[in-house]
Swiss-Prot record:
Its biological purpose: Chaperone involved in the maturation of iron-sulfur cluster-containing proteins. Has a low intrinsic ATPase activity which is markedly stimulated by HscB.
Keywords recorded for this protein, A-Z: ATP-binding, Chaperone, Nucleotide-binding
Taxonomic superkingdom: Bacteria
Null mutant phenotype: Essential, it cannot be deleted.
GO BP terms in the entry: iron-sulfur cluster assembly
Organism lineage string: Bacteria, Pseudomonadati, Pseudomonadota, Gammaproteobacteria, Pseudomonadales
GO molecular function: ATP binding; ATP hydrolysis activity; ATP-dependent protein folding chaperone; unfolded protein binding
Annotated protein name in UniProt: Chaperone protein HscA homolog
Family from the record: Belongs to the heat shock protein 70 family.
Name of the coding gene: hscA
Length: 619
């Protein structure tokens, strides 16, 4: 849907004047910019006819961006930043987990954000990404001969809120107006002609330099819906390079404790070997006095565990979508790493059909983003509009009594979305409520990820359960979350926009999904136990309050003793592991207090009617 355009009174947009917009694939290894010219989408190359590497080298008197920077990585590793996409939206603790894969010196900034120490001082991942985006913007404006109105920038489907916000911040630093963040698999589907009325279910297999995404899409005329997404935020072609580099270290008898320069050189050798093996049966490698031959078969054995990880994510996504492999009408391959023959064979074996590789897998995402950018800029395409429906990768919810996770927006819900649920107070006279926002698939708070906390104050004091608090979750098209809470009686409201100070650690999303399946049975039992404990505690507090208020007036000593004995029995099993035992004691306490509850009700009615005439009651 086109963005709203506003003109001065009496003016109208020129119908044949195109507004300049681009699509940007901000990749881990390479970054591309594409646009529409004469109705055709094309990638805008550098003057040398290639795409810039996602690399920035900082020098005392300036900086270099692209392939020139990447070429210097082996001789100046501490000042040359590669694969910065892996650092976007992450904290210093996450960076330390990556260990030897990142040969940089890090400093901790505000909110535990990592900064890379360079000769120009500390640089954040956002600043590094902005350098790459700035080069892409300038190239586009030079090629198109004008100023850009904006860009659609692609991100992995599994980027969380912090990573998406970091991408937007980098674009802002680069002087770019972000029309939209678009999931990379979504962009690939657009590039393959969604707007031409294709129908059916399609799998997008996206294996780039640093991330893997699988999306199951339903394509119908004018509507694009993502049925399910999955993937691995720490799996890509870089890992293939590391597998070969580790093999070289082993074969050459090198020490495992290598300095950054040697690491860079080995990775460059590995990357060249990987690319050569896509066309050749073997390749000769040399490092120092060592020389060896790496066959395609041996290479495929080295990467087989990595390929298997991608297939496992594919099967999980199919299960989430409720789709069998044979129902997939087409498999679209995205990302330079899908050129590896073993990867293509694996996808063909899983889905029982040859994957589509008609469009350059390195360019397909940028081209799809360019098509979407052209539409959002208001240029339109053949008078048609395109509806893109992305999904959130993990469930969003909040903490309820008993430290339980109450899901408000389930995972794989189509975005943008707004969902609301009503909650109430737990204690008499409660005037504030702490809202704890969570992300994850497990039943208990301790097994989910905390996103934010905020407090709603001003709740009118009343008995427990009387107040009504409506909590609304809103997720926009870019996956950013806003949570608000409103007390319906007083109108008091509080809200928070979730921009975590750091993102998920590598593999955390995959682990969270895996755990939700493995522990489903235990989680269900644990939730049932917690719910029963909360109900029992609420009953105990209510009965205790009733005894203090009316026990002396409405109960005989024997009746009171029986109730208190049953209360003590319930307290004795309250912290036990058996929900059924607690439920039995709750039922016994309810039965022994039934007569007491009836007397209290009668007393309340008599008090309400005392001194009133019959005609007053009838009125």
């Amino acid at each position: 849907m086109a963005l709203l355009q506003i003109a001065e009174p009496g003016q109208s947009p020129q119908p044949h004047q195109r507004r300049l917009a681009v699509g940007i694939d901000l990749g881990t290894t390479n970054s591309l910019v594409a646009t529409l010219r004469s109705g055709l989408a094309e990638s805008l190359k550098t003057p040398r006819g290639n795409d810039p590497a996602s690399a920035v080298r900082y020098l005392p008197d300036g900086r270099r961006v692209g392939r020139a920077a990447k070429a210097a990585a082996a001789v100046d590793p501490l000042n040359t930043v590669l694969s910065v996409k892996r650092l976007m939206g992450r904290g210093i603790a996450d960076v330390k987990l990556l260990g030897e894969q990142l040969p940089y010196r890090f400093a901790e900034g505000e909110s535990h954000m990592p900064f890379i120490e360079t000769v120009q001082g500390p640089k954040s991942p956002v600043e590094v990404s902005a350098e790459i985006l700035r080069v892409l913007r300038r190239r586009a404006e030079e090629a198109l001969g004008g100023e850009l109105v904006g860009a659609v920038i692609t991100v992995p489907a599994y980027f969380d809120e912090a990573q998406r916000q970091a991408t937007k911040d980098a674009a802002r630093l680069a002087g770019l107006d972000v029309l939209r963040l678009l999931n990379e698999p979504t962009a690939a589907a657009v590039a393959y002609g969604l707007d031409r009325g294709a129908e059916g279910v399609v799998a997008i297999y996206d294996l780039g330099g640093g991330t893997f995404d699988i999306s199951i899409l339903r394509l119908t005329r004018g509507v694009f819906e993502v049925l399910a997404t999955g993937g691995d935020s720490a799996l890509g072609g870089d890992d293939f390079d590391h597998a070969i580099a580790n093999w070289i270290v082993e074969q050459a008898g090198l020490s495992a404790d290598l300095d950054p320069g040697v690491q860079r050189h080995l990775l460059q050798l590995a990357c060249a070997a990987k690319e050569a093996l896509s066309d050749s049966g073997s390749v000769t490698l040399a490092y120092g006095p060592w020389q060896g031959e790496l066959s395609r078969e041996r290479f495929e054995a080295l990467i087989e565990p990595l390929v298997a990880r991608s297939l496992k994510a594919c099967r999980r996504a199919l299960r989430d979508a409720g789709i069998e492999p044979q129902e997939i009408a087409a498999v679209v391959m995205v990302g330079g790493s899908t050129r590896v023959p073993r990867v293509r064979r694996a996808a063909a074996e899983l889905f029982d059909r040859q994957p589509l590789t008609d469009i350059d897998p390195d360019q397909v995402v940028a081209i799809g983003a360019a098509l979407q950018a052209d539409t959002l800029a208001g240029n339109g395409r053949d008078g048609e509009e395109l509806l893109l429906l992305d999904v959130n990768p993990l469930s969003l919810g909040l903490e309820t009594m008993g430290r339980l996770m109450e899901k408000v927006i389930p995972r794989n819900t189509t975005l943008p979305v707004a969902r609301a649920q009503e909650f109430t107070t737990y204690k008499d006279g409660q005037t504030a409520m702490l809202i704890h926002v969570l992300q994850g698939e497990r039943e208990l708070v301790k097994d989910c990820r905390s996103l934010a906390r905020f407090e709603l104050r001003g709740i009118p004091p009343m008995v427990a359960g009387a107040a009504k608090i409506r909590v609304t979750f809103q997720v926009d098209a870019d996956g950013l979350l806003n949570v608000s809470a409103r007390e319906l009686g007083s109108g008091y409201e509080a809200s928070v926009q979730v921009k975590p100070s750091y993102g998920l650690t590598d593999g955390e999303i995959a682990r969270m999904l895996k755990d939700s399946f493995e522990y489903a049975g235990g989680d269900k039992a644990a939730r049932a136990l917690r719910e029963q404990q909360v109900e029992a505690q609420r009953l105990l507090e209510a009965v205790q309050a009733a005894l203090e208020a009316d026990g002396e007036a409405l109960l005989s000593p024997a009746e009171r003793a029986a109730i208190e004995a049953q209360m003590q029995a319930l307290r004795g099993v309250l912290d036990g592991p058996d929900a059924a035992v607690i439920e039995t004691h709750v039922r016994h306490l309810t039965q022994v207090t039934d007569a007491f509850a009836a007397r209290r009700l009668d007393a309340s009615v008599k008090a309400a009617l005392s001194g009133r005439r019959l005609n007053e009651i009838e009125e």
